[in-house]
Amino acid sequence: MKHPLLRPWLTEKSTGLTEKKGQYVFVVKPDADKTDIRNAVEKKFGVTVKSVRTVNCLGKAKRQQTRKGLIAGKKSDWKKAVITLADGQSIDYYSGSAQKGEG
């Protein structure tokens, strides 16, 4: 698969995971599997991936009131991956590079 990583998922919860456990969260393509995600992270950031966990998230149901009545729809389903790196390694989301800790 070509480029399964779409973007980092930056929330309070994901930032806490990064600070406490060294885990990083990415939004990935829905048809990406764990080996594709692992290979993409290792290639893009030059780090060693310890584990990959994925979650399929269902899109929210949306409704909109118009003159003709209620229009029902749904946002697209999406997938996120929680990636654990080897000890002493980190990823800088903003520069797109990896950093290795001392020790």
Curated annotation (Swiss-Prot):
Role, per record: One of the early assembly proteins it binds 23S rRNA. One of the proteins that surrounds the polypeptide exit tunnel on the outside of the ribosome. Forms the main docking site for trigger factor binding to the ribosome.
MF (Gene Ontology): rRNA binding; structural constituent of ribosome
Keyword RNA-binding among record annotations: yes
GO biological process: translation
Gene label: rplW
Family: Belongs to the universal ribosomal protein uL23 family.
Assigned GO CC terms: ribonucleoprotein complex; ribosome
Subunit structure, interactors included: Part of the 50S ribosomal subunit. Contacts protein L29, and trigger factor when it is bound to the ribosome.
Keyword Ribosomal protein applies: yes
Keywords: Ribonucleoprotein, Ribosomal protein, RNA-binding, rRNA-binding
Record-given protein name: Large ribosomal subunit protein uL23
